[in-house]
Structure formats: structure tokens, C-alpha cells
Amino acid sequence: LKASANTWNYTSGMRSYSPVYYGLEQYDVFTGEYSLYNLTPNTVPYLGDVTGGRDGNTQIYFEARLNWDKTWGKHTVSLMTVGIRDEKILTNGQGGTIYYTLPERNLGNSGRFSYDFDKRYFAEFAYGYNGSEKFIGDKQFGFFPSFGGGWITSNEAFWGDGLKNIISLLKFKVTYGKVGNDAIAGREGRFFYLSRIVDGGGEYQWGKIFSGTYSGFTFDRYANPDISWEVSTKYNLGVELGIFKDEALKLQVDFFKDLRENIYMERENFPQTAGFQRSIHGNVGKVTSKGFEASLDYKHSFNRDLWLTARANFTYSTNKFLEKDEKNFRDEYLKSVGQPVNQTWGYLAERLFVDQLEIDNSPRQEFGQYMRGDIKYLDVNGDGVVNTNDRVPMGYPTVPEIQYGFGLSGGYKNFDLSFFFQGNARVSFYIAPEAIAPFINRRNAPEIVARDSWSETHPDVHAFWPRLATYQVSNNVQQSSWWLREGSFVRLKTLELGYTIPKVDRLKMSNARIYFSGENLFSISAFKLWDPEMGGNGLAYPINRRFNIGLQLNF
């Protein structure tokens, strides 16, 4: 059994006093009588109460766990079940709304049954039966089972010692399971089965000519008792391979597929003729993702003085929408279904306008005023107008589809060295022209803008920066291929070099180590303007590069 309670509250109050001041209005020097008048007529002559701040967090957690293990002969069985109850209030200073002042409650039971025979064959069943306050009726609780199996081929009798000296481990594994998610729509997305009505948000018109408006009640969210758990169905097939004695070289590869259903999102295709004041949401999305991940580890001691360990990992993952309640676009390229979740759409930029004659004979661009030296976009659908209907999917997703890392640690006698590289690939980002545009908010011009921008004396229609202006040119800050960049990079994330000083008896010191370390030392990327991990704003705070020199003493 395990139970915990944690509470923290903060309340502040202030009292104020404003004295009353009087001035002499009349005074009789013979009788000594006088009259006064109030110089501060709006002052309250007693202590006033001024509301202060209020905040508080409370969490109560209870857990009951039962474990049972039994081994007889070549059979091993393990059982485990856990029940939890979690209640928490996290106001975050939002004391005026029930979504922050009412406790959040979750109740659940999970368990696992595992069996193995002779350390060769393995089977496992696990489940989660979870309840959430966000849903109602038969949707409040969800049951999410999973199954798994494994076979260590290298433990079979036919895997002789000669083969085991070369391949010390060969294991195959497969899993299938479902996972539920109720963390949808944030804190104010609680109680989907209740409507949220606010006062003073509406404008109701009265009179024969509707000349008068009055505030009143309006819907901020509509009740939807059909909202339920997002469910993810996961498939995994993997292999583990150990080579040489004690698995000196170990390779793990896992292939996975994930199908997410009932994704909570806006119903964009809901008819406007329904007359709703707010957007409608529901469990209407479906996304599939697949890929593989691999890791490679190596460790070896060559002798007492020389040792080496190395590690590398690689992940490749793609996804796409299978279902999404989106607008009924006429053109297929505007639809999200079939595209990655983090895919972006933009305009195809041809070049910069040469002159006014070209502008007059080109499709009209609906992004504000533009002139020679501004970006010219392609009219994709050929209707004579460039607008949101001409956006096309471009580039890679904004989340990398490939992530990898590799590093090494080694030592020779008293010296040691370690480093680790980190990188990603198949990722795109857009330069944010509104964030780096010169002359706006007293902003200086980045070097690339000063060196390569369109001007009357430098009318390059392929210059990096379009026509300069002291204001933001709306036409030129549209998300387009003009600003699209490939964001792949590899970075030396950490580096450490050390030297261990042997035992010093006079100082009663067992050993000491002096070291130098660095973080984010350099990166390699096709994008050269700034660190690609910063994204589109090259004037933002850069990635920190750190250097450390240290001394470790052990007595």
C-alpha cells in the first residue's frame, strides 16, 4: 500500500486606510466658533479590505499493489495488479472557474500476468481499466489490454557452445496492445457532457430596425456526451542480437505501427447553416504511424589500461491522417487526409516581380499591396487569383522523421574521453520574415539581408530578401517556398576529457580527477544562416554553448 498527500496554499490580503482631511471654511475670532469642509469627500474613514492573491495546489494519491511469483521446475509465473486513486486540485491562480477549483479525479486498475518456460519461451498479458471524470456513462471507463511473446533462440539446445561464442544472444519478440488517452482539450476541456454558458458575451438586437443591442447569455461550448477516450493500437516486432562473449556487441531493432483512433479535434466540415456560435469538436480523427528504431552497443576491455564503449541509435518514423473532419475542399492538394500530421502548406514562390507591367499581367495576389521587388506567387488552380486555395503541401514535416545519435567513451591508463553526437533529418522549417525584418521596432538588418536584398541598384529577382520597407509588407511574409528551408543537422552535443590522479597518501585522498567538458560545441548543417535548431527566428536567443573545467576529489 502507498498513500501520499501534498498540499500548498497561498493567500494574501491587504488592508488600507485613507484619512479624512478638513479645511477651515469659517472662523469667528470673537466667539471662537468655526466650520470645516471636507477636503476628501470620497474617503472612507475606516479600514478598507483589498483583495489579494490566492493560489493553491493539493494532491491526494492512493495505490494498492499485489505481487505474486512462483517458480517450479522450468516454469515461472508472475502476477501483479495495481489499483490507484488520484485526486488533485491545481488552481494556478485561476480561482474564478470550476475547471481549476474542482478536483481532478482518476481511478484505475492495471495488471500483468507473465510466464516463461525454461528461459526460452515467454508470454505476457497486461491490461488497464481506467476511469476518467471527463466522460460520462459507459464511456467513463475504458479497458485497454495488451499481449506479448518472446523466444530466446540462443537458449535452445541446438544452439551449441561454438555458435554461442559468436552469437551469444538471439531473441525475437512481438507485442500488441491498446492504450487510452484522456488528456485531451486541456484543463478547460473537462466535463465534455456539460455546456458552458457565459454571461455578457452575446449581443442581442431589438427593435424594428435592430438598432439596439443588449448583452446576455451565450454558449462558450456545447455539451457532447459522446466524447470518449482516444485509443491507440500498437504493434511491435523486434529482435535482439548479442555478438561475442557477454554480448560485447548488442544490436536491437524494433519495427512498430501505431493506429490512433477517436482523436479529439474540431469538426471543420460542420454546416454553418446550423447556426452555432462556437466550433464543434468530437472524436473524429484517425492517424497511423509506422517506422523502426535501432540501437547498437559495444563494450570491451582490451587490457587493464585500455577500455572502450560505444553506442548508436537511430529512429525513423512517419505518420499520416487517415480520417479528419475537414472542409470539403475542391482541390485534393488542400486536404490533410493522406498527409503527415505536421505537414505544412504554403504558396509556391516563383521569384520577385520585375516591374509594374509584369504585375498588371499576372494573377492578382490577395495579400495586401505589392509592387516590383515583392514576391510573385504561382496561381496553382489557375483561377486568376492567388489566395488560400493556392496553398500546397511542401517540404518535410516540422517534426523530424529521422533522429539519431552516436557516441564513444574510452580510457587509457589515467586518461578518459567521451563524446556524443545528436542529429535529425527529413525536417523542414520556415524562416520567419516578420521576426527578422529590418527597420521595424528599431531592428537592425541581419547580415544576409544587408548583403543580399532587392533594391533599385540591385534588382536581383532571386535575392534572399525582397524589397526593403520600414513597415511589414504583408505580401512578403506569407508562408511560402521562398522561406522554406531544410532543417537537418548533426551536433556535437557533449564532449568530456579527463585525467585521474592516483592515490595521494599524504593528503589522505583516494583519487582526484580533473576534467574539461563542453556542450553544443558545433553543428553541421546545409542551413548556414544560424543554428537550425532555433527554427525560423534567427534573432531569438541562441542555443547555449558551454565550457566547464572541474576538479573532483575523493577522500
Question: Could you say what each language-model-derived stretch is?
Answer:
Residues L1, S12-M14, T71-V77, R120, ...:
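Short loop/turn motifs that connect adjacent beta-strands in outer-membrane beta-barrel proteins
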Residues L1-E63, N67, T76-S78, G83-E104, ...:
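Surface-exposed, low-complexity loop segments enriched in small/polar and acidic residues
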Residues A3-T11, G83-T91, Y129-E133, T153-N155, ...:
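Transmembrane beta-strands of outer-membrane beta-barrel pores
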Residues N92, G160-V231, Y235, A248-K250, ...:
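Solvent-exposed loop/turn elements at secondary-structure boundaries
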Residues L102, T153, D199-K250, S279-N303, ...:
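Outer-membrane beta-barrel signature, preferentially recognizing the C-terminal barrel domain
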Residues H281-S289, E332-I359, S453, H458-F464, ...:
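C-terminal beta-signal and terminal closure region of outer-membrane beta-barrel proteins
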Residues G282, K299-T398, E456-H458:
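Conserved small-residue
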